[in-house]
Amino acid sequence: MMPPKPAAEDVADEQPEPPDEDPDVAEADPTGRYLRYREIIGSGSSKTVYKAFDAVDGIEVAWGKVEINERIMGSSKELQRLRTEIQLLKSLQHKHILKLYASWVDTNRRTVNIVTELFTSGNLREYRTKHKKVDMKAMRRWAKQILTGLEYLHSQKPPIIHRDLKCDNIFINGNHGKVKIGDFGLAMVMQQRKTRSIQGTIEFMAPELFGENYNELVDIYSFGMCMLEMVTCECPYSECKGFIQIYKKITEGVKPAALSKVKDAEVRGFIESCLASVSDRLPASELLKSPFLQSDDANHRSSNSVQEPVKFPENNFTKDEPIFVSLAPNNGTVNGKEQSFILVLQKSDFLLEGNMSTTNPVMLFLRFPGPDGKFKNVQFPFDMEKDTSLSVSTEMVEQLELPEWNNPVLAELIDAFLLHILPSWKPCVKVGKMLPSSS
């Protein structure tokens, strides 16, 4: 019979000395079960990860040491809260969350010690850098696993937000392609629905993190940046010089230059839905239903099934309102060819029209209510090979300074128009009921 497995204490003021017979061992945990080697396998601004060994199970593990700041060390209340959060993280059991074997607070050395399972293939950034040619099918599998892990974290009561999700903190087993979310050094249990402290890696931080409040949807934004890095092999905002320039772009809503390098409209649309404003951003449970992740063929499109587009939150003003469709005479020409009709779509006070032509780009005309209550008109080209409804509507909302809830309405009208002239078009948002116009 195996002896009972010892468990590390939550708090340890003194560390056992390393075994004399092994000079490579730097220290042991309070129970003596886990032995930390001197070999460093990862590091960050406040954390160092070492290779370690589980003497009971005979397996290699990872031992992370996270520095505790002065504010926590000087408060018994904060220390107790830290221990409570560590206990909760130890209780997490999910196939896409890195297993946490033991953890304890070392008050003398002012560190939190965390022992986890070891992934020998490293993190996703290292793996993607090593393997340049990765099919989108594999990246979709990674994305689904990451979102499944986030869905689990966010479904806890209260929800757990990671706050520092990035490719460095997602670990992969190269033998079977399994990925797990790890490095919970900044993870936080949401004692309230809103929180106010700012921590994380700036390139992956959602804009609302710089404001007063945020919730678990900041992890979805970070996931979108992870997807962007996976697809392009380029760190978001690598075009910027320094923290201030990145901060300015994020707070002004300017997306990374790498996004323009994503040529596949469906992939780009999925990433953009993750990077949408917080009021329009979908939770992990909804993103897992997206057509992009449901498709399994090499071109990530299925011709044998009809997928429901991602549902996008709408303003109550336009909720459930149908799109009225009509044809209007047009005596103009496109590329020298006569166009006898234009397609007109109207939803509430928004009107979109364009020629019944599949010539690329499609010229569209939009009539919409401006912030001052007066109707405004704008004409714009839509590149069916490069643009998505969401990328264009987001740009229009930003450039024209429209309310955020206009975004899904405009995207829906664009997708509805394109479905009429190109039935194979894959919409980014849910297209509601379309009815013939009486006028």
Swiss-Prot record:
It catalyses: L-seryl-[protein] + ATP = O-phospho-L-seryl-[protein] + ADP + H(+); L-threonyl-[protein] + ATP = O-phospho-L-threonyl-[protein] + ADP + H(+). The keyword ATP-binding applies. One of its GO terms (molecular function) is protein serine kinase activity. It comes from the Eukaryota. InterPro entries: Kinase-like_dom_sf, Prot_kinase_dom, Ser/Thr_kinase_AS, WNK_Ser-Thr_kinase. PROSITE patterns: PROTEIN_KINASE_DOM, PROTEIN_KINASE_ST. Signal peptide: none annotated. Residues 1-30 are annotated as: Disordered. Belongs to the protein kinase superfamily. Ser/Thr protein kinase family. WNK subfamily. This is Probable serine/threonine-protein kinase WNK6.
